[in-house]
Amino acid sequence: MPYEWLHLTTLVVGLTDEVTEKQLTALIAEARKRLADVRPATVTLGRVLYHPEAIALEARPAGALAPMLDAVRTATRAATGREGILGTDPWIPHVTVAYSSAEQPAEPVIAALGRHLPDCEVTVDHISLVVQDGPENLWDWRPMATVPFSAFP
């Protein structure tokens, strides 16, 4: 995965043909308002998660990111009338580091990486609204806005 595409998926607002320009503008404004009270959160990446089509690092503790998720969900509802879609249910915050569209055995990858990499702390201090089109290996990735968390300790 290209470095600039590394991300922690928070919420999928909807398909690109379902969200209007007016809703996108409203969503950005709502996110700025809601995230004004959210503090940056430090999480640890290290535990490796395996999926048939991806390898990810879990962001722990998930609770540290709950205020951000709540703010984004509230902004999404206010701007679009939709709930948004979590990547997993229950939500497991993670950073995907590799995708695979080939059929291949997972065992060699699991043997090479194991279940845990050295811990790495990262601070999440903003969200980005990104429009993605196409399959995962050929995304058209267009950042629409970056919204910082405004509440600092």
Residue ranges and their predicted role:
Residues 1-153:
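Histidine-dependent nucleotide/RNA phosphoesterase domain, centered on the 2H-phosphoesterase fold
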